[in-house]
């Protein structure tokens, strides 16, 4: 908004917007150009080298599915003058081992996040997000909210960028006061939310069905409140409240440090099974 759309490019697995005059690039870690010699390659006029490189949410290096990409960027992504890695404090101990010469700093949340207990869907305050897992459950809750409360926007990772952005705009402009979403709202979206309610704390993570970890709950609950505006979180629709110690950890932003990052060689040998096994995912 400050620089204008002609100065900023966007690359994700779904979108590629590269204005000819762009000098700033926002992208997912999987899509970002790494290495000083890597060109964008589409004639958009973007530089091959970047003065500044920032990687956000580096705690995801501990995620089994995407972690190896974040670890690769931690090891190899560098700006000419400055490189910044942003994320949860839980990643700091491992980052200190990997980057012994880096300077570390921290910023406290400017607003208070507090637990508001359990509320029925019909009793949730306006400007709330209701978080569920599974397409059917999200649409079922959204339809109920539309009938009982007058309207709801829907945000899921599997929506097309255009549809997802339209739903976010619908909520942000105040056309509806409720948002029903998956944990896709936990990262990459800054929304004017006063309250986040979990309708479920169980998700399928690609390998198994499990409960959310306290850190994952905090990532979602932390969408409530913005800047100096306090926020609340709770449960709804039959979801059991978290344990008291989990609530306390979320309110105080206090979690166990990540013990392992995932790593995979960027030079995978597809010539033999032995070569693939030797370069398979490992913990570091």
Language-model segments: residues:
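Conserved ATPase-coupling elements of RecA-like P-loop NTPase cores
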Residues: 35-38, 59-71, 189-192
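Conserved segment of the helicase C-terminal RecA-like domain
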Residues: 213-248
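Inter-Walker segment of RecA-like/P-loop motor cores
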Residues: 3-37
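Conserved strand-helix element at the start of the C-terminal RecA-like helicase core
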Residues: 84-85, 125-145
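Conserved RecA-like helicase motor core of SF1/SF2 enzymes
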Residues: 177, 183-227
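Conserved helicase ATPase core of P-loop NTP-dependent helicases/translocases
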Residues: 160-181
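Conserved small/polar residues in nucleotide/adenosyl-binding loops
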Residues: 282-284
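Post-DEXD/H (motif II) to motif III coupling segment of the RecA-like Helicase ATP-binding lobe
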Residues: 60-110
